[in-house]
Amino acid sequence: MKTMTTAEIRRAFLNYFSENGHKIVHSASLVPGNDPTLLFTNAGMVPFKELFIGTETRDYRRATSAQRCVRAGGKHNDLENVGYTARHHTFFEMLGNFSFGDYFKAEAIPFAWRFLTEVLQLPAEKLLVTVYHEDDEAYRIWQEKIGLPADRIIRIGDKAGKAKYESDNFWAMGDTGPCGPCTEIFYDHGAEIFGGRPGSADEDGDRFIEIWNIVFMQFERDAEGTMKPLPKPSIDTGMGLERIAAVMQGVHSNYDIDLFIHLIDAAAKAVGCKNEGQASLKVIADHIRATVFLMVDGVLPSNEGRGYVLRRIMRRAIRHGYKLGQQGLFFHKLVAALVAEMGEAYPEIIAEQARITETIRKEELRFAQTLTAGMQILEQDLATLKGTIISGETVFKLYDTYGFPVDLTNDIARERGLTLDEAGYEALMQAQRERAKASGTFRADKTYTVSGKTAFLAYQQEQTESTIEAIFVQEQAADTLDCGDEAVLVLNQSPFYGESGGQIGDSGVIYHQNGAFLVSDTQKQGDVLLHFGRLQRGVLSVGDTVCAEIDRARRAAIRRHHSATHLLHQALRMTLGTHVQQKGSLVDADKLRFDFSHDAALTAAEIGAVEQLINEQILRNQPVNISEMPYDQACAQGAMALFGEKYGDIVRVVKMGADDFSVELCGGTHVKQTGDLGLVKIIAQSAVAAGIRRVECVAGLAALRYCQQQETQLQRIAAVLKSDLEHSVEKIERLQQDTKTLEKTVQQLKRTVALGGTQETAESVVDIHGWKTMAVRRDDLDNAILRDTADQLRDKYQLDVVVIGSSDGEMARLVVSVAKSAAALKAGAIVQTLAAFIDGKGGGRPDFAQAGGKNIQGLDAALAALPQALPQK
């Protein structure tokens, strides 16, 4: 056995299968394309799912890949185990070879065996395998073709007490669909390592480690559980790169392989930790991989969906840095170390290094602020805590509202001899999960069972004769459609464009003399177009010859807006820099929305420059050239491949503008000349997430309407100001200055009134338990004036404590100011007692505190209750 680095193993695997007729497919995005059932790509077969289920075809039947995967959040969630076991990761690479009806068991098993024993040179005697207990074919191949002795081929049955086929050696894509037995290859680390053979009571030990799983997709399971043989059985295999690297490098933990040794060393230096065996360093090293690769695929930290999972991963890593004593910013510094380790295999992280580093740094700053805010809330709740249990409501509020980690709340509680109401917290979390589930987040879309494919004519025609191949009413196949029915139609050929690449689907009509179906939307399902709509009149049936006609005016508007995204993308790159990359888009008939990587809002000058570049290309009225060529050739010519899109070997290249101003891979519909756009105008911009901006634009007649609306508004403003447009800005500026002067005068008058100076104020000084106090009410004052007034009254009358109550008609407020000489008094404790009268809560420093509540009627009672809040002097 020879020693190999992680990079060498990855390269050797892909080259081996390429030499054996497999197409090398670059890792797909961690954000699954067109699969709302998955949060993240979590297995090597995910990018090929549509090939396995037969809804898509490609120009190859064998493939191999090193697929980037994430398991954190959702059904497959390894997050809490990461750092504390030898083989759990949030991010990992899955090496795989796949056959889509090409070869099967007799070829797949020898492929794996030869790679392990000949390429990697693993000792054959160190390998043993498992097979499904009914899979005699796989057993015979291992025994007769490979030559494994019977004692190293283990049959694994169904799990005790479970249904048939519920086994570690039987794989299924879901409750229905493709499935089949699998064979797993294990490596024996030796008798000195604890652990039993697969299938034994001690199988969870570390002696026998699974390194490769080969799935034989040979059945189709229907809703009744019946297994039918697939006409073209397929192969899906997976070998964790980190696991096989551990074997090849003679270590028992994935965290001891070359890649992780370097990342852990970088993490140790970043946090100032000398003990590199710390579990927290493993967490940080693992999480920087997940963080960087999720970001390079367009995921950004947020409070929902994938962004929420990313934020949780990042904050968990940062929290572990804090546990090691690092209170400063450190996590973003590890991006460079990861790029050094994996940039050669994944050059996209090199291109995105600066943006990702800055995004992580900003999230670290945000988390530091979160911790500060969370600690204040926690301290306020602890000040009124009765007993030793922090309520589930408090823990949930800290976590859900402020992003305050539950483990941090638990640490603080433990330091103070307190515990958490974990049951209450879990109940609130479960309720939140149910709400999320009900909202349909990441719900599974319906798959319609259709044979064949739709001939796609959207590039050539806007109307065509077609045949109805299938009808679905309420998701069930039907032969006939009656007037008023909402349905989905499938045609043998169609001029309709199915939603993809950010461009919405076409609408229009499908009709013959006896019926008309209004199409409201068109979607793609693999190679089939689904036409959604309603039968407006008559009857339509499967087999009918119909005319399919798109809404031409709507298509033209969509076409203009889609074409405008190309010019916009390039204009943004020329104005802001080449770091700008498209991160998403939505194109419809009314406007376009374009998301891109950039850290700051566009200035007025930058917006003007972008619009200038776009409209210059429009005025040149150059032809839009569209051609097809191999993917590699297109990229070599500088064509930009866009985020989230999947490309085949042959791609569509769209060149737009003079001197090839924009060159992109795109499957959408486009204008014939740049002049067809008429005018493009940016109408809005916003922040989508950290490091991602969004601009909205209009083109053509929509741009004209926008300009006319803006002009109308300006004319109305000028009329209200009783000015002309030329001098309106000057008049507004004068009005603003006058308003500021008046506001300042009002604030000064309020302060004068609040301080009083009358006999009533002096008479409000009262001795309570030996303390010189004042409790007065001053309504309709803002917080700043209340604070200043309390401090000034305290100093003016040399008081130990001042309490001021105030109401603005909606809320009651209390402020407490304590003199430094009255060290025995705590403003926070005083305000907590008084806040109960206004149904509120409060807190603050020993010398100043404030509270707010909704019970205005209780304000006078709160002031009168000051004696209850003061101890004897």
From Swiss-Prot:
Principal localisation: cytoplasm
Record carries keyword Nucleotide-binding: yes
A family per Pfam: tRNA-synt_2c
Highest taxon in the source lineage: Bacteria
Keywords: Aminoacyl-tRNA synthetase, ATP-binding, Cytoplasm, Ligase, Metal-binding, Nucleotide-binding, Protein biosynthesis, RNA-binding, tRNA-binding, Zinc
Residues that hold Zn(2+) according to the record: 562, 566, 666, 670
GO cellular component: cytosol
Alphabetical list of InterPro entries matching this protein: aa-tRNA-synth_II/BPL/LPL, Ala-tRNA-lgiase_IIc, Ala-tRNA-ligase_IIc_anticod-bd, Ala-tRNA-synth_IIc_core, Ala-tRNA-synth_IIc_N, Ala-tRNA_ligase, Ala_tRNA_ligase_euk/bac, DHHA1_dom
Keyword Ligase: yes
Cofactor comment: Binds 1 zinc ion per subunit.
EC number in record: 6.1.1.7
Known cofactor(s): Zn(2+)
Catalytic activity reported: tRNA(Ala) + L-alanine + ATP = L-alanyl-tRNA(Ala) + AMP + diphosphate
Subcellular location: Cytoplasm
SMART domains assigned: tRNA_SAD
GO molecular function: alanine-tRNA ligase activity; aminoacyl-tRNA deacylase activity; ATP binding; tRNA binding; zinc ion binding
GO BP, sorted A to Z: alanyl-tRNA aminoacylation; negative regulation of DNA-templated transcription
Family the entry assigns: Belongs to the class-II aminoacyl-tRNA synthetase family.
Domain notes: Consists of three domains; the N-terminal catalytic domain, the editing domain and the C-terminal C-Ala domain. The editing domain removes incorrectly charged amino acids, while the C-Ala domain, along with tRNA(Ala), serves as a bridge to cooperatively bring together the editing and aminoacylation centers thus stimulating deacylation of misacylated tRNAs.
Function comment: Catalyzes the attachment of alanine to tRNA(Ala) in a two-step reaction: alanine is first activated by ATP to form Ala-AMP and then transferred to the acceptor end of tRNA(Ala). Also edits incorrectly charged Ser-tRNA(Ala) and Gly-tRNA(Ala) via its editing domain.
UniProt name for this protein: Alanine--tRNA ligase
Annotated source species: Dichelobacter nodosus (strain VCS1703A)
Lineage: Bacteria, Pseudomonadati, Pseudomonadota, Gammaproteobacteria, Cardiobacteriales
The encoding gene: alaS
